């Protein structure tokens, strides 16, 4: 399949990108490789520079040497030496404490020098790759020395990483403090899930294809499942995870972003606020949870010992920096409803967790059965036909599962998949998931970034769960083995409604092997699926 593009995308605006926390993994693993990819695509301006700011004792020379040593570890394909030298010549470093006013003056001097050398036209792009507890402090210090001003055609934008607070109150306070220095249009709250092609394609899939949108409602859809599963444990993040847990870490940002893009009404345009208005409507339409709802429709879990790829792995309570009697959840499953005409009485089931059977993120749309089962006497292995799955990671694409007649002399039904695969149809991507987000920030397009009201609405939706779980500490942790799909209570959550979680991986394998399994039913000359 050939990709088509009506017009070439414009080159990103000239700017100095300032990375706070530049010595951390995010810079090496994601940001620099993403910038390299943008340069290779012709989307990064020649008038560009990077200034790293961190506490680590380095200077520009040693920072460049560190990146030079690390780049081969995190860039998926070899980097052209000339291209990499182009970057190194534009990378600078300022050492300092985020609380030290003198460090910000040194930073300002370095920014002005880089601007003069590389002609970045006074445009500034601050990336705060630090804990949210530093967001307000850093923005305040930048404001005090004039590094947040927009004047004479110059722009300044600030990207902040999740989490955006730790509850509704802290999110509201953070937004208030940021807006004392910045306008909403200057604040870009990043969610790297939205940098994935399939997530961006979800709106195109829904609103550019006339055969899809008419089916996208309560009349035809039985329920929706959203899964964000990780096969790894908390690794070196035990200290952070003890203060957060799976609910706060994943639901108000990643999972709610996927939910809103799935459920939103068509926007009047693809301008940033037009899209985000519709996403915010969904968050505000989430049915408020009572304490009884939380007990019935919210499941928490914590992983115990188990195996991952044949290797024994420890329980969460035995991870570094985790309390031996910790009640922090590493798994969450929720049943939510949206109170509007399109989705009334259609449940949305969300689940996320650590040390699960497979690393996968997907949205599964289960369509309703036909009103009259014409082929009800015909054996079929799995009655849950007509399921669409939007695969987000690790393999991006869309598949639609439906019933078809197995070739042969008798009426036998089998399940087949109609697949769109990004790697197969467009070629393998080397994207880190940050390219589009960095480019959009340079261009001032906030469509894929959360707005303040969306952040607060997300926290408000899970506030009842936070309160109930705080009042009623979990019992029986750990309650699922590493390498499983989570606690039994998550299965029960759907079983009570006569439904079940999608058998991720198994269904795809079934589709591949079903032809072989039915070989004896086919006559000569028939085709396999």
Question: Where do the PLM segments sit?
Answer:
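Secretory/organelle targeting and membrane-embedding segments
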Residues: 1-160, 164-529
